[in-house]
């Protein structure tokens, strides 16, 4: 060294002194996340929190023994800067001196080792692509990479030495030295560490890395932040409250159990490094590699123990390691070294190489060919040497190595290893597949242990090998990732023969050749179990890209032999490394996602592995099938399919579902790889093939998951599997959310930087919607990307989207138009779906779907993570977040649907769900041709769906046919209904996810375009989608009781995003957790909450018209595509994502993104808001959602029906498939709608819900795009309905003709019933459209009666729906109601059919009478002016009402809108649009107009729906007209409030008026609340009563009543609405008041829109109130106005407050002056509590219990200042004079401005009010009496009188006046 030892020592002493100063007194290490106490002592945050958590009582400062509390802790940013600078100094010191700085004083050793290693490694790394790395670093980190490297290296070394060396140097200084030397390189990592927490760091972290990493994270806030999220993501279990906490924990754990923490560290590091750590990673991975070999062994040992502590992981890993060691001892040893290198180097190197790869991804392969060969030879030698050393090392070392490897790679490998452990004969196969993981792990472990044995040799071999391996690996892995991700199995196959082949293959990966796939397929065929296992492992690993590649390679290697394995293992590790690098490089979050997935896999590994092992062969087949499909050789795919059992395939589906996230990760990684390789931009086809590959991989991945799932075929195992799966998915989602959050950030940056553009496109291919939003922020490109992924041709997509739009107008046209580009794919998909040969293509498409879904979900998670931590992201971000959340929740929802179906109708619903989901996925993926695919698919898919083997494809195919097929298949497959249904549910789950995600994608995709058009409109909808999805995710997850654990974890996972929704979700969870019935309830609830889930799951459920569903979705997709309007998309998403409503609250209020808490706080609220918001944000969306909601309820009914009779649904579905074909004639159907009313109505009713949702979307489309879309879609919907209801048409017609008799049938066939009823209602609607309001009302009445009997259940459900919709706001209650209804659906429906049916019938009769009266009134109020439209609305509303109070409302609104669109809109689009526009344009007017619409739609629900529709349409129109986000937000807010208030309230009201009749005023209140514009006033009341109603049979009855009322009202009211909203509203109000004279003041209050102000609250409390207001759609203003209804005061426990201006004005105005506790308690109870109990009783001045506010509120007719003339004279403080004057005016006084203006005369008493202390002149106010004869009093007289609301005597307030001496 140039520096003398003395100088170095001096510097070191200075640094040591500085370090001691900056040491935490508790942990004696550099402070991480410094926090200062009140006594100004600095500690690590984690240490302090640990200290505080240890003691129950007050904790004492360790230094001064003063009491400390968590609140007293304050972050010390300056101190953290000092620590960071110290770390930089240390890094610089290390770089300058070549010494590792730690506690160690072994600088000589370190110097010697480090220079050599640094030289070797640096040279090698440089040769491999160090420049690229630098470029990468420069790209990702604009900072000077060298400096960062240096400083970070020093930091890392320091950190490593500081912590690692302290702990581990003591253990093994040499290792530490090695590590440190490497660590100096890894200083780079440190730099990247914050960004990267790079592999080196990881390894540092793994060795001592946690601490180091933590310090490193301390090093930079970025690191800390990234690491924090990553740690959070990875170490969900470690729950990183702060980096320091986690880091400290991890550091200590790393020391104790480095592996565990290292695993998280690795993930964290991987995520963070993202592309930053290229240089550092290269240096560091070498260093860390060496360290890993030695230190890692220790760390791994500790980590192994730690892992042991990790229950499932520890065991599975331990077993794995043991087994893997035994099985793959020799193989592993080489592989381990590679892996260690890969882990140490690889993570860094992967990143480096990926980075290198990105720039040089294509060239490096050529250059890497030689290195790869060299690497292979060196690997062989090293492997041999390691094998020998491994034997010497023994199990401990090997375990250590294994532990570490496992920590990193084993996360994935654990699962695979578990599979290995659990498989016997298939264990070999599994070992080939899983064992490669194990081999990777074991090999890495062995490498570590061997490295521990001989660090020098390890260093030499490892360094050289790593460098070579890393470099080839990187490019090779890139190939592998690209090809390997797509063609991982072929790669594995090819990898055996030649790495060069792989490289070559990899280059063509972008344009994957059939040969590759065929080879892969052949390999799969040859060693199907092996390959499948490999594929499975690969899939999972692919999820964790490096692992997938590695496992694939390892699998190949194992398959080839140990010798081959040596190369393959290196290849694997390299591939893994490369994959990791690619992933890390493009997206460190991706790595983190992978790692998280790995961790998730690890945590879930035991169960999954067992399952996988058990069904590894079959899974392998499924995997192979998937792979083949994705790969492209249809023949091979077919063979594979044939080889796979249908149940296996189903399992595969299930698995595919599960791995969707992994797939997403893979796809993200693939996207990144394309970004890296820059292949995507150049080769859309390549991308498409890649996407297919990705699809294959996702499927493989899915297959892996299904493999595991399949293995746990037993129900318990399934549950276990499902639970692990869900937790795993949840974790993945959660982690991915966090990671993806990082990724989301990174994607934006990367995408912006162009790195991600490829990735984005690729991601878009797979799941790029989020990424696309990030990149495009809602631009066509994003749509293009989305559709690219959908269609697989990014470049063509924008046009495709357009063509899709056009095509959507004409579904067939869309099919053909969109099919231009898509059709090749679409038809390939569609027909392949239809045909087995094409099945592979379809599979690839479905894989695309799943890939899209997976990546979309991944991106979604990224976005969602981002959403959570960056709620105010730009619109694109918001949309991204929304989409992400949508996708995320979509995933959960998919899980939920499977859960739901597991609970309720696992077999049929799940299958159908799958089918629905898949088609939707296809639709979404196809994004336009999905319509084609789905339309044709149902029939074609029927063919495939018949084939269990095709099941994966079939799921999409099943949409129409899956009901029939799935029912048999399900029954056949469901012979183990619990086992397979979970598989199906999983599949459904995944499919739902995909579908939802795809819909979301489309939504997002289209949302982006509209976003451009509409500004934030899309984003809000996306946000709302996200929110709702979250809610729905949770609800769905919670919904499945068998999957309750799964649900629990999902909920937990979603909980992070949904915790805010958590309150109601928790209720749901609680309910779900309590009983399975509640589970179903939750499911149904979720159906309500998540109509989309239901639609998706229940489209399967509603298998009657899954085709309609499909069409609905297609329409939705079409509509969305056609419109590209966020509303339509919202509708699509919302429809697919019932959660959309809640989301829409968010959507409507991006604040809800911020206020996820709001949504979370009040899921019911969020849901209500969401539904209402959905209505608000996009009226059509909400309508669509409402109609979807109804549809889900219809589906719920169908679900019941499924339970009762799935066959009927099957026939329904068959009808649907045929219907799909007829869909193209929708316009004809539309025109012939009235003619076809009976059959159409039935179908329409079935489709009504779907179609209505579609129609809502369509209406939005028609509003947005044109009436044509609406008509087409209406026609489509109607056609679907007709087709769909064709069978039911008879019933519907019968119902129509003999509603009562059909009622029984409907009752018997609730599932059919609901659609029929819906159909009938729609028929009636149509008929009433044609015939008129009267007929509509009569039919509605009869239909209502029908409903009363047949729909009684449905009505109860509808009531549930209504209440759910209303209670969607109520959330828990709604959920409870829904769950009650749901659980009661099967059992209660029977009860309902008996007891409640009679009650409902009676109520319906009463309702009919009431409706007749209402009709008369409404007709008087102008339903006549626009008879056709009103009748249309009335009919649709009435029919919809009949169908479902809310459902019918939604549908009514939709149909009304549709009909408005079709008729009025088509005829007079301006009228409807104007109406809607008025509603939306007048957000404020919207209240009135909404009421008007309400009124116009006499049925509040219909009117609300109309209103909603109008609102959403007007929102669309308005947004179209006023795309500005502000307007949208205004509309959303106003509409949200008004719609939710009047809308939901209207819905509740109309439907609730009867309910109120039944149940009394509370409902009436809510009804009135609905009636009233003031949703804020009683949304909670609404919801609560609604829930009560839902829970109560009377509520069902009332619901039935409501529909009639609604129908009658809607029949007349729509005309009124169109004619005069005011007249309609008045008529409605009059009729309502007549009907419900019992409406209380509270109801009246609810009728008024609630508006509140707050006084005396802290910002936190204000935010809580704000959330509360948002949830309950209360207007929250800063100033009190005449519209203000509530003044929220900060009070003490006795409701005593300080006197403020708002307090006085509130009392003077007779407002509700309530305590802040009203808000808090309402939030706690998830409903708006009665204000009476929280009214302010007094104030600190006038008395603590003077009851002034109550007196004022109840005495507004007796004004205290009546007859007084008051002149407020002179200056006043604390209160403007005009406010004081307004106050006295409010109290009945007349204000006089001037003293000379007093009126002289009898009966008027003038008073002059002054504030003496405000006068600057001492006696100025004493002379007032000279100017007038009035008494002069102080202002206190006014204030006291107002506060007490009693006119006080003037005597005590009089100011003595100077006598008039001049007289």
From Swiss-Prot:
Effect of residue 1655 to F: In BC; uncertain significance; functionally impaired in vitro
Tissue specificity remark: Isoform 1 and isoform 3 are widely expressed. Isoform 3 is reduced or absent in several breast and ovarian cancer cell lines.
Outcome of swapping residue 1686 to R: In BC; uncertain significance; functionally impaired in vitro
Impact reported for residue 826 to K: In BC; benign; functionally neutral in vitro
Protein name as annotated: Breast cancer type 1 susceptibility protein
EC annotation from Swiss-Prot or TrEMBL: 2.3.2.27
Effect of residue 1835 to P: Mildly reduces affinity for a BRIP1 phosphopeptide
Effect of residue 1766 to S: In BC; pathogenic
Region (Interaction with PALB2): 1397-1424
Outcome when changing residue 1448 to G: In BC; uncertain significance; functionally neutral in vitro
Modified residues (Phosphoserine): 114, 395, 398, 423, 434, 551, 694, 708, 725, 753, 840, 988, 1009, 1143, 1189, 1191, 1211, 1217-1218, 1280, 1328, 1336, 1342, 1387, 1423, 1457, 1524, 1542
Summary of the function given for this chain in its UniProt record: E3 ubiquitin-protein ligase that specifically mediates the formation of 'Lys-6'-linked polyubiquitin chains and plays a central role in DNA repair by facilitating cellular responses to DNA damage. It is unclear whether it also mediates the formation of other types of polyubiquitin chains. The BRCA1-BARD1 heterodimer coordinates a diverse range of cellular pathways such as DNA damage repair, ubiquitination and transcriptional regulation to maintain genomic stability. Regulates centrosomal microtubule nucleation.
Effect of residue 1862 to L: In BC; uncertain significance; functionally neutral in vitro
Outcome (variant: residue 1770 to V): In BC; pathogenic; functionally impaired in vitro
Annotated consequence of substituting residue 1407 to P: In BC; uncertain significance; functionally neutral in vitro
